[in-house]
């Protein structure tokens, strides 16, 4: 018999592979950081031995979820400004609060708290854009989470850098510092067309090309932005991106609410990736992204929560439920966004958006061992006829029982194993006191 590091025995395994393999009374064998084999419990009891056996009975076992767009450290700003339009929210509340409060300490503890929230709701990989991203990388590494992240680039000063050139230099340092890390990858991340000059966008694109990494930005989040960009640029957003050489397979575009039919065809032809953020777009009344049309055209679309200041949580199960239902009611068509499609957006398609589809997002031999166990032995999850329906319309993040990332168990029976959750919450409560005091100052 072959010895492996960990055996998961029993339960329903959803592989989310090319054939959407489903195995009842399934099993996983883990060797080091990777999946050695996927099969049945009966087969594996005869084939493998392990000192670490996890009982998967009454569990749903699937790839860890991929949060394709968030701002992790903004857990520290959860609920400080709600019920207002995007530009008012950003310009009069979020940017001033960040200018007064964001420092390495806030970003580290806020990001670590986000990791706690994400792991406990089944997310194993996330894509982050924020300030002092070295601290987010450090927090993710401590938590044991997989991530793609980048320092947000602006034309104007941020709490971390004074000029666009400093921001690009900081990004270059991140690319060097985290090169080859097993969990942390770096992207180049200009904030948006309305906060970045053509020259900054061009240099960002050149840096992404030099290192062959993704370039991620917010794009056409609402109709006001679309109108503003037309006036500022004298052309539409995608024409500008095309002129700058940014429309290619490395582009990850967040939101994409105002893509028209021609834009969608361009995304398809150029291989650009998109991220759907329905709850944030609803809360800020930004509009409806044309997600069904993008999917029909074969565009790779992931699912993201956005940050805690505009959602206000990081639970991708809740996001899946909203994503499915919102598109149905928008078009008055219950067949749109079927559950299986939405689960793929939150797993294998999300991994593809981030350029990690050879690493995570599905369960098969050779892939990194990023997976979750959902406890089905609960009243609201009994009985189960269709596991994909369950995942989208019934499961809550709190139903996640056990989480593995890169072959390591990071949560067991709802208890985090890689860091002190209580200490993290205490630190964020302390930071929140100075944030609260700063909000009393006039803008």
Swiss-Prot record:
Enzyme Commission number(s) from the entry: 3.5.4.28, 3.5.4.31
InterPro entries, A to Z: Amidohydro-rel, Deaminase_MtaD/DadD, Metal-dep_hydrolase_composite, Metal_Hydrolase, MTA/SAH_deaminase
Function: Catalyzes the deamination of 5-methylthioadenosine and S-adenosyl-L-homocysteine into 5-methylthioinosine and S-inosyl-L-homocysteine, respectively. Is also able to deaminate adenosine.
Protein name: 5-methylthioadenosine/S-adenosylhomocysteine deaminase 1
GO molecular function per UniProt: 5'-methylthioadenosine deaminase activity; metal ion binding; S-adenosylhomocysteine deaminase activity
A Pfam family assignment: Amidohydro_1
N-terminal signal peptide: none
Lineage of the organism: Bacteria, Pseudomonadati, Thermodesulfobacteriota, Syntrophia, Syntrophales
Organism: Syntrophus aciditrophicus (strain SB)
């Amino acid at each position: 018999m072959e010895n492996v590091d960990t055996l998961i025995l029993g339960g329903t395994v959803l592989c989310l592979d090319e054939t959407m393999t489903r195995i009842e009374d399934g099993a996983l064998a883990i060797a080091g950081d990777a999946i050695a084999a996927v099969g049945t419990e009966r087969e594996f009891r005869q084939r493998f031995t392990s000192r670490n056996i996890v009982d998967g009975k009454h569990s749903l076992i699937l790839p860890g979820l991929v949060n394709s767009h968030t701002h992790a450290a903004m857990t520290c700003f959860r609920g400080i400004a709600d019920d207002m339009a995007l530009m008012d929210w950003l310009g009069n509340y979020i940017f001033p609060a960040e200018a007064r409060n964001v420092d390495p300490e806030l970003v580290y503890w806020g990001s670590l708290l986000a990791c706690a929230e994400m792991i406990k709701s089944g997310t194993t990989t996330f894509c982050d854009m924020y300030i002092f991203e070295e601290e987010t990388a450090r927090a993710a590494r401590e938590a044991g989470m997989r991530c793609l992240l980048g320092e947000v680039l602006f034309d104007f000063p941020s709490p971390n850098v004074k000029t666009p050139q400093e921001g690009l230099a900081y990004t270059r340092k991140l690319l060097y510092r985290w090169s080859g890390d097993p969990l942390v990858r770096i992207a180049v991340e200009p904030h948006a067309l309305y906060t970045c000059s053509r020259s900054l966008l061009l240099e960002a694109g050149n840096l992404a090309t030099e290192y062959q990494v993704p370039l991620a930005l917010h794009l056409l989040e609402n109709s006001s932005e679309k109108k503003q960009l037309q006036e500022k640029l004298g052309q539409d957003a995608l024409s500008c991106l095309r002129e700058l050489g940014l429309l290619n397979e490395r582009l990850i575009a967040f939101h994409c609410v105002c893509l028209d039919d021609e834009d969608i065809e361009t995304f398809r032809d150029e291989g650009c990736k998109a991220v759907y953020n329905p709850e944030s777009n609803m809360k800020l009344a930004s509009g409806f992204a044309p997600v069904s049309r993008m999917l029909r055209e074969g565009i790779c679309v992931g699912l993201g929560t956005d940050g805690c200041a505009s959602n206000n949580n990081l639970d991708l199960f809740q996001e899946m439920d909203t994503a499915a239902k919102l598109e149905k009611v928008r078009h008055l068509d219950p067949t749109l966004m079927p559950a299986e499609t939405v689960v793929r957006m939150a797993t294998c398609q999300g991994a593809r958006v981030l350029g990690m589809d050879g690493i995570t997002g599905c369960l098969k031999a050779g892939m990194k061992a990023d997976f979750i166990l959902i406890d089905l032995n609960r009243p609201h999850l009994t009985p189960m006829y269709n596991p994909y329906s369950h995942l989208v319309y019934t499961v809550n993040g709190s139903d996640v029982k056990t989480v593995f990332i890169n072959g390591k168990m990071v949560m067991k029976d709802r208890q985090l194993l890689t860091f002190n959750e209580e200490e993290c919450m205490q630190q964020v409560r302390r930071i929140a006191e100075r944030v609260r005091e700063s909000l009393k100052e006039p803008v």
